[in-house]
């Protein structure tokens, strides 16, 4: 967890920022972190960073376009030095809040905060943002971010008392709350909404900046129509992929490979891990000549790094029990064989 001093420093940055620009990861932890901080100060715009794993110089066009006075980076493990140098050149402060197991940036121009580096716990950025904003009315937004990132926060019972109709009673794991409750369904609606056109994602974000409570998301009207439509479309495809993946259980390993126009790998990996607790889950999405991989299981980070070791161009990393990797499809057989040996 961040220290009280660090939390106060971030609050000061937020209060000072008159036109902040938030870059955040393309998942519920990133989205809800942005929403919690934007709703706290009532200003600022958000940019979803779909490129993995870093915020690179190509993203700076949004800075040139929107002319912010502050840059906040949320839930991203890497930021390119070229991006930092350009912000420095433009005299724009950068506040970077993360929770991944990575080294702090060497460039001290960046105000860097990482919950993993503080005590090794690595609470999600949505949890940190909730503690920073300290707005009880947004407890449900924070909870969505936390359970989506496999973290059961200390405010779960408080949430359950406020929204008993949405909560699962006494969940044993974060994914119990995510997959066996109504707040979990709302989380999946938002997650799938992020996988839409840029225009629709921006409209969803604008709606979420003003929404007063979770039930508004479930009410079908002109504002929520596209959000719910996207969920229905993707959920149908997602359930079919799940059914196919469930067949691929072998000993300790569940390995599933698929293709298509859209990656749902981390969603599939999370739910399969929930359903098959004792299995090591590997979900591979193949697009042209690249394989994007989501991995879930004990020591997933060590297994991932060992499996991609010495594979040219391969990248990977993440948390202890949840990681991602990217490599050329020609190297997939080698990667799969290594994983099988490491988890047998």
Where are these regions (language model features)?
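Accessory alpha-helical/coil subdomains and C-terminal extensions
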Residues: 154-240
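Long, well-ordered mid-to-C-terminal structural blocks that present hydrophobic/aromatic surfaces
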Residues: 217-277
């Amino acid at each position: 967890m961040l220290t009280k001093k660090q939390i106060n420093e971030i609050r000061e940055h937020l209060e000072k920022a008159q036109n902040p620009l938030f870059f955040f990861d393309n998942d519920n932890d990133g989205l809800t972190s942005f929403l919690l901080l934007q709703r706290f100060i009532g200003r600022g715009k958000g940019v979803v960073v779909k490129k993995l794993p870093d915020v690179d110089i190509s993203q700076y066009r949004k800075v040139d376009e929107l002319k912010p006075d502050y840059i906040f980076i949320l839930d991203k493990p890497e930021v390119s030095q070229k991006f930092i140098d350009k912000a420095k050149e433009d005299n724009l402060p950068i506040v970077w809040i993360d929770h991944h197991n990575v080294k702090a940036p060497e460039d001290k121009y960046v105000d860097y905060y990482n919950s993993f580096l503080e005590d090794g716990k690595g609470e999600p950025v949505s949890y940190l943002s909730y503690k920073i904003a300290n707005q009880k009315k947004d407890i449900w937004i924070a909870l969505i971010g936390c359970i989506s990132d496999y973290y059961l926060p200390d405010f779960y019972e408080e949430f359950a008392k406020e929204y008993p109709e949405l909560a699962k009673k006494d969940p044993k794991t974060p994914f119990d709350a995510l997959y066996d409750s109504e707040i979990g369904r709302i989380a999946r609606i938002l997650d799938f909404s992020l996988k839409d056109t840029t225009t629709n994602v921006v409209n969803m974000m604008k709606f979420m900046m003003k929404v007063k409570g979770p039930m508004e998301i479930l009410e079908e009207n002109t504002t929520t129509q596209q959000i719910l439509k996207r969920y229905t479309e993707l959920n149908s495809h997602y359930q079919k992929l799940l059914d196919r993946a469930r067949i691929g259980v072998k000993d300790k390993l569940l390995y599933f490979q698929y293709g298509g126009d859209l990656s749902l790998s981390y969603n599939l990996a999370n739910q399969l891990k929930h359903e098959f607790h004792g299995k090591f889950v590997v979900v591979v999405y193949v697009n042209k000549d690249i394989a994007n991989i989501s991995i879930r299981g004990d020591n997933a980070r060590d297994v991932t790094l060992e499996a991609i070791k010495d594979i040219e161009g391969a990248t990977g990393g993440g948390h202890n029990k949840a990681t991602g990797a990217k490599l050329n499809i020609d190297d997939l057989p080698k990667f799969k064989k290594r994983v099988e040996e490491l988890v047998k």
